[in-house]
């Protein structure tokens, strides 16, 4: 088993049982293609989401280092920050969140509802900044200030997307391969590609476990030219940690995120409504709605390698629906 080195890394178990991998019969009929969905939106903390897989490794490392504070950064409506704050609460740690308003809105729901509301419930210390122009440097500067106040901070990068956090999605690839074995031969896997850890972790894992399946990242914030090096660098860093080779080509589609990160578009919102009405499953306006718009258009434009079954990775994010109301 090529991924045996995963067990070398300390890991807290927040998720327990594998998340469901489900067939979508009504959605499949609508699109004329077999569509399956990996339900990482139903991980069991703080309204679910993919970041919990990364936090199993990152929080374990924080405890190993003797930290009493988790520090991270993101947008006001960051799913990652919400899940980090929940993990901190569960472990009895302080959480400091450096937040930006990337869409420059004054809409009350965006500023106070959705994920931002949940941060207050988790007793998160909020620090606002004008923009996360250099988040790694800004997080280190914040950590220095927090340390000067007598805390022992552990910095978690935006999205939990470093090599250690991304191991959570190598682990997820193992889970997916086990769920598909003997049941379905997945031709293509579609995932939202943002901070790149989920995409890169899946790329490393699926290359070794399901090499016949193509993995497509639908970008939510950047062009292919800007996103590709982020994913490739993480892919190689993960492979180095696991003492593996990673030579799979990284495939990205950047046609679906305009006008920009965190700004809903018509195609993404149509995808949100479609899955809700056909399957009772909630996507979000920022990540999964746009990724699903890519899947839908990819079928109509014949962009996939063949007409075999497609697996959509549902990374969560439904709390943002409340933040973006009445625009959804």
From Swiss-Prot:
InterPro entries: ACCD_DCysDesulf, D-Cys_desShydrase, D_Cys_desulphydr_bac, TrpB-like_PALP, TrpB-like_PALP_sf
This protein's encoding gene: dcyD
GO cellular component terms attached to this protein's record: cytosol
Taxonomy, superkingdom: Bacteria
Broad class of enzyme this protein falls into: lyase
Name of protein: D-cysteine desulfhydrase
Modified residues (N6-(pyridoxal phosphate)lysine): 51
Family: Belongs to the ACC deaminase/D-cysteine desulfhydrase family.
Induction of its expression: By sulfate starvation.
Activity dependence on pH, as recorded: Optimum pH is 9.0.
E.C. number: 4.4.1.15
Thermal behaviour (record text): Optimum temperature is 45 degrees Celsius.
Known role: Catalyzes the alpha,beta-elimination reaction of D-cysteine and of several D-cysteine derivatives. It could be a defense mechanism against D-cysteine. Can also catalyze the degradation of 3-chloro-D-alanine.
Assigned keywords, A-Z: Lyase, Pyridoxal phosphate, Stress response
Catalysed reaction, written as an equation: D-cysteine + H2O = hydrogen sulfide + pyruvate + NH4(+) + H(+)
GO BP: any one term: D-cysteine catabolic process
Subunit structure as annotated in this protein's UniProt entry: Homodimer.
Cofactor: pyridoxal 5'-phosphate
One Gene Ontology term of the molecular function aspect: pyridoxal phosphate binding
